[in-house]
Amino acid sequence: MSPSLQEGAQLGENKPSTCSFSIERILGLDQKKDCVPLMKPHRPWADTCSSSGKDGNLCLHVPNPPSGISFPSVVDHPMPEERASKYENYFSASERLSLKRELSWYRGRRPRTAFTQNQIEVLENVFRVNCYPGIDIREDLAQKLNLEEDRIQIWFQNRRAKLKRSHRESQFLMAKKNFNTNLLE
């Protein structure tokens, strides 16, 4: 082996190799911090925690797992039982639930909006008149109904999809009825 290759081999043995593009490095899991300050995302449905209660900085408390245990994936993939038991031993059930809640906004999920009967009646009345309301109408509705405008926009999208689905089903039933009567004649 040439001397330069021997030096390279010795350097590799003495120094642990770390890639700047490794998953641990990108996610910041290689840092020895108990608390990683985060910028506040616009997620009004997300639970927030403040680090001191006074400054209002968001803080995600993620305990560092002991060496040899990899950090659990945020994506819900089935894990082999032996790996799952390692996590169960390290994190308590309440810690796992808390961590899942804190990271849930990464998956893009939000709690389902529960509309009151009054809100549904008002939205249905507007839908009967105009199933494609403009931004000005949606903003007025949002203010009157104490909802966010984007929730109202989604409600109208879902309502139009429901109307289209029911129209398609009624067309199918009429065609089926006509087909059956033609067969009997």
From Swiss-Prot:
InterPro entries documented for this protein: HD, Hesx1, Homeobox_CS, Homeodomain-like_sf
Q: What is the effect of changing residue 160 to C?
A: In SOD; loss of DNA-binding
Which GO molecular function terms does the record list?
chromatin binding; DNA binding; DNA-binding transcription factor activity, RNA polymerase II-specific; DNA-binding transcription repressor activity, RNA polymerase II-specific; protein homodimerization activity; RNA polymerase II cis-regulatory region sequence-specific DNA binding; RNA polymerase II transcription regulatory region sequence-specific DNA binding; sequence-specific double-stranded DNA binding
Q: Name one GO biological process term.
A: stem cell population maintenance
| Annotated localization | Nucleus
Write out the entry's keywords from A to Z: Developmental protein, Disease variant, DNA-binding, Dwarfism, Homeobox, Nucleus, Transcription, Transcription regulation
Which SMART domains has this protein been placed in? HOX
Q: According to the lineage, what is the superkingdom?
A: Eukaryota
Task: Describe the protein's quaternary organization and the partners it interacts with.
Answer: Can form heterodimers with PROP1 in binding to DNA. Interacts with TLE1.
Q: What family, per the record? A: Belongs to the ANF homeobox family.
What is the disorder linked to it? Septooptic dysplasia: A clinically heterogeneous disorder defined by any combination of optic nerve hypoplasia, pituitary gland hypoplasia with panhypopopituitarism, and midline abnormalities of the brain, including absence of the corpus callosum and septum pellucidum.
Q: What does this protein do?
A: Required for the normal development of the forebrain, eyes and other anterior structures such as the olfactory placodes and pituitary gland. Possible transcriptional repressor. Binds to the palindromic PIII sequence, 5'-AGCTTGAGTCTAATTGAATTAACTGTAC-3'. HESX1 and PROP1 bind as heterodimers on this palindromic site, and, in vitro, HESX1 can antagonize PROP1 activation.
What PANTHER family does the record tag this protein with?
HOMEOBOX EXPRESSED IN ES CELLS 1
- What's the name of the protein? Homeobox expressed in ES cells 1
Q: What species is given as this protein's source?
A: Homo sapiens
Q: Which gene encodes it?
A: HESX1
